[in-house]
Amino acid sequence: MNKLNSNAVVSLNEVSDSELDTILGGNRWWQGVVPTVSYECRMNSWQHVFTCC
């Protein structure tokens, strides 16, 4: 297990911060959080759609 972890650390050292942000999705306009319909429902911005009738 220690050998696996040290290999992971060595691999991460080769990746720059900007490349890591791209891989993890942190450099997108939504800051790594993908806006979904369920997220919007929790935030009540879609409430009028579901309660209009």
UniProtKB/Swiss-Prot annotation:
One GO cellular component term: extracellular region
Membrane-spanning regions, if any? none
Outcome when changing V15L? Reduced protein production to about 50% of wild-type level
Prodomain residues: 1-26
Q: How is it modified after translation?
A: Maturation of lantibiotics involves the enzymatic conversion of Thr, and Ser into dehydrated AA and the formation of thioether bonds with cysteine. This is followed by membrane translocation and cleavage of the modified precursor. It is not established whether the 2,3-didehydrobutyrine is the E- or Z-isomer.
* Single Gene Ontology BP annotation: defense response to Gram-positive bacterium
- Which residues in this protein are found as 2,3-didehydrobutyrine? T51
Which UniProt key words apply to this protein?
Antibiotic, Antimicrobial, Bacteriocin, Lantibiotic, Thioether bond
Instruction: Give the recorded effect for P35A.
Output: Low activity, less than 10% of wild-type
Q: What is the effect of changing G26A?
A: No mature protein is produced
The taxonomy runs: Bacteria, Bacillati, Bacillota, Bacilli, Lactobacillales
Q: What is the effect of changing S16 to T/A?
A: No loss of activity or protein production
Swiss-Prot/TrEMBL puts the cross-link Lanthionine (Ser-Cys) at S38-C52, S45-C53
Q: Which family does it belong to?
A: Belongs to the type A lantibiotic family.
* Gene for this chain: mutA
Highest taxon of the source? Answer: Bacteria
Query: Entry's InterPro entries?
Result: Lantibiotic_typ-A_Lactobact
Which named protein is this?
A: Lantibiotic mutacin-2
User: Which species expresses this protein natively?
Assistant: Streptococcus mutans
